[in-house]
């Protein structure tokens, strides 16, 4: 879709900000092999944006670390990322995160290309 191309830089920014918060909140308990995929970006009539993103990890243990006890760490990651996105985009942001386990995701050539990381 046409709107998907125009918001591509913002979609990448959203993924990078969420990824940064994962590293800050997990204190390097989760390897840097974690990635974030912005799944949807929806402009709202009130000027806000709704972003849905997947945090992708390689193992169940990493998923548990990212989610935290009772979802507390995932909530903290989302709150901090949302606040930073609102500052960067200068508008209200509704951010929804979920965690996926995708074994060996980092070896998937198509996904690497989609993230702008061409494998050697």
Positions of predicted regions on the chain:
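C-terminal-of-GTPase-core extension/linker across diverse P-loop GTPases
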Residues: 1-120
């Amino acid at each position: 879709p046409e709107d998907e191309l125009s918001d591509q830089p913002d979609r990448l920014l959203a993924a990078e900000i969420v990824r940064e918060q994962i590293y800050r909140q997990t204190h390097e308990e989760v390897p840097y092999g974690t990635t974030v995929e912005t799944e949807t970006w929806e402009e709202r009539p009130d000027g806000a944006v709704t972003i849905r993103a997947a945090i992708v990890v390689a193992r169940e243990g990493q998923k548990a670390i990212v989610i935290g006890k009772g979802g507390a760490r995932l909530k903290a990651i989302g709150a901090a990322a949302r606040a930073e996105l609102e500052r960067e985009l200068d508008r209200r942001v509704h951010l929804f995160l979920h965690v996926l386990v995708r074994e060996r995701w980092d070896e998937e050539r198509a996904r690497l290309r989609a993230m702008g990381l061409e494998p050697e």
